[in-house]
């Protein structure tokens, strides 16, 4: 056997063993292991092999992007029944953005599994954020094709959803959404907003709002609209609750 073929065979064997351990780690066994390997195959690796032992992961990345958006959207829709469409969109964007996907990928050491060409390897491709984010999406696409949406949901329930519950993305929410998220996380009860006062002429109206938790006042706020007053009340409530933590 020519040395190059021997080296490639040894390389493949090493990675097959790594993929076996990876599946054991996540508790999921692929029916079609070729899909799993394809998810981690960068185009640079395919370009350096004439016979193309695997397809690259770009098509799986395309599919995984859509599957990830769908599943995260469904989770947020169910978890935050009072959150507006705009806030849901903003929160979803923070969860599926590149830095977040890189964080998820690094948590499972995705970089160590990627099949790379020599040039990409030498230039640090294994740690490149865009590459890792793409691999995470490709893995979601492969998992969907191999086992369906239910298994994808179960995987995200272990890796992604807990971070939402821990408040990792609260910084992109408005004050009312942040307060709702904090209360839901602690299981403390129901939040209600009341407009206590409207004052001033019609062209310069001022509203005063109060937010309560289980009928206990948490914060007061004022603003030129009911929405602004509620946001300010929520901001004061958040400040108080965080001081107590």
From Swiss-Prot:
Domain of life: Bacteria
Residues of the DRBM domain: 174-243
Gene Ontology CC terms: cytoplasm
One Pfam family matching this protein: Ribonucleas_3_3
SMART domains xref list: DSRM (SM00358), RIBOc (SM00535)
Biological process annotations from GO: mRNA processing; regulation of gene expression; rRNA processing; tRNA processing
A Gene Ontology molecular function term of the record: rRNA binding
Keyword RNA-binding attached: yes
Cofactor: Mg(2+)
Entry annotated with the keyword Cytoplasm: yes
Subunit structure of this chain's protein: Homodimer.
Sequence similarity: Belongs to the ribonuclease III family.
Record function comment: Digests double-stranded RNA. Involved in the processing of primary rRNA transcript to yield the immediate precursors to the large and small rRNAs (23S and 16S). Processes some mRNAs, and tRNAs when they are encoded in the rRNA operon. Processes pre-crRNA and tracrRNA of type II CRISPR loci if present in the organism.
Protein name (Swiss-Prot/TrEMBL): Ribonuclease 3
Organism: Bacillus anthracis
Gene that specifies this protein: rnc
């Amino acid at each position: 056997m020519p040395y190059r073929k021997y080296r490639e065979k040894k390389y493949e064997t090493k990675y097959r063993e790594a993929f076996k351990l990876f599946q054991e780690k996540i508790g999921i066994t692929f029916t079609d292991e070729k899909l799993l390997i394809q998810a981690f195959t960068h185009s640079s690796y395919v370009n350096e092999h004439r016979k193309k032992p695997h397809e690259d992961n770009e098509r799986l990345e395309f599919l995984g992007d859509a599957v990830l958006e769908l599943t995260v959207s469904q989770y947020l829709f169910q978890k935050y029944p009072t959150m507006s469409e705009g806030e849901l969109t903003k929160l979803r964007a923070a969860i599926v953005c590149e830095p977040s996907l890189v964080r998820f990928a690094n948590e499972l050491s995705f970089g160590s599994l990627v099949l790379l060409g020599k040039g990409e390897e030498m230039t640090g491709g294994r740690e490149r954020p865009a590459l890792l984010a793409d691999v995470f999406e490709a893995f979601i696409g492969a998992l969907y094709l191999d086992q369906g949406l239910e298994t994808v949901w179960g995987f995200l329930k272990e890796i992604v959803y807990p971070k939402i519950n821990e408040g990792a993305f609260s910084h992109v929410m408005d004050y009312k959404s942040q307060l709702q998220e904090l209360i839901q996380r602690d299981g403390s009860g129901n939040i209600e907003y009341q407009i206590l006062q409207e004052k001033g002429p019609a062209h310069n109206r001022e509203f005063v709002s109060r937010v309560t938790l289980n009928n206990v006042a948490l914060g007061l706020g004022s603003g030129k609209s009911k929405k602004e007053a509620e946001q300010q009340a929520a901001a004061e409530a958040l400040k108080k609750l965080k001081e107590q933590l």
